[in-house]
Amino acid sequence: MSSSRPVFRSRWLPYLLVAPQLIITVIFFIWPAGEALWYSLQSVDPFGFSSQFVGLDNFVTLFHDSYYLDSFWTTIKFSTFVTVSGLLVSLFFAALVEYIVRGSRFYQTLMLLPYAVAPAVAAVLWIFLFNPGRGLITHFLAEFGYDWNHAQNSGQAMFLVVFASVWKQISYNFLFFYAALQSIPRSLIEAAAIDGAGPIRRFFKIALPLIAPVSFFLLVVNLVYAFFDTFPVIDAATSGGPVQATTTLIYKIYREGFTGLDLASSAAQSMVLMFLVIVLTVVQFRYVESKVRYQ
């Protein structure tokens, strides 16, 4: 089947049509990235009135800073927990829809509710439930002799921000997994059932391979979400504490730039984070995507 390219009467019309998107991209993406790169090579006074070119000194200082290296590894752990937990839990709930006969519509609606909640509100909600003195969940844990105080325990603080972040993202993942599972031809599932395959075997041998492209897409989306969009959760829940136990790269950039007024260090950190995300995305699309294609 042959396809024909669109023909425009004016040679400038195609450029005019893409101009709005190009302008938005330049103003809100390329320009800020260029300024961040420029400031990362400067030594800037706290008020931004004067600067001096220092080359790569900011990056050298950065990787000799133990607090920055700690936030680097904290980001890796946090992103891994949020991405893996979010995908597994969402896939589990999406697979349960097939086995819920009564109230399936109510179940689906209930699963979509977290997506309507702002990230900061989601964090505050779980702070109330995990409040060391009056929280409902902490009271329940105390009945079993478990003392909860995320303001003093770094492990509990990490669990809280991961839990709140996963809960906020679960609706998005659930929606895509549910749509992918529903798109699988029922004839394949029925044929496997006739051959004697149980529900678990049918899921791992048929459903899971067929939804691999959607899983890969959600892997990339959740990784970006964990790197950037969880900032409101961390800020509202722990403010990066205790003792910087939940300070991720994006939160340290905010703290250095807006609280510490160190624009050069903040810009250098943002460049490192951008480079890290680009590398991870390229690796995923280059090596992981090739393993999820199917005929």
UniProtKB/Swiss-Prot annotation:
Major location, coarse class?
membrane
This protein's record includes keyword Cell membrane: yes
Q: Which InterPro entries match?
A: MetI-like, MetI-like_sf, UgpAE/MalFG_permease
Query: Boundaries of each ABC transmembrane type-1 domain copy?
Result: 76-284
Q: Quote the SUPFAM superfamilies the UniProt record gives.
A: MetI-like (SSF161098)
Topological domain (Periplasmic) residues are 33-80, 131-156, 229-262
Name of the protein in its database record:
sn-glycerol-3-phosphate transport system permease protein UgpA
Upper lineage is: Bacteria, Pseudomonadati, Pseudomonadota, Gammaproteobacteria, Enterobacterales
> Which gene holds the coding sequence for this protein?
ugpA
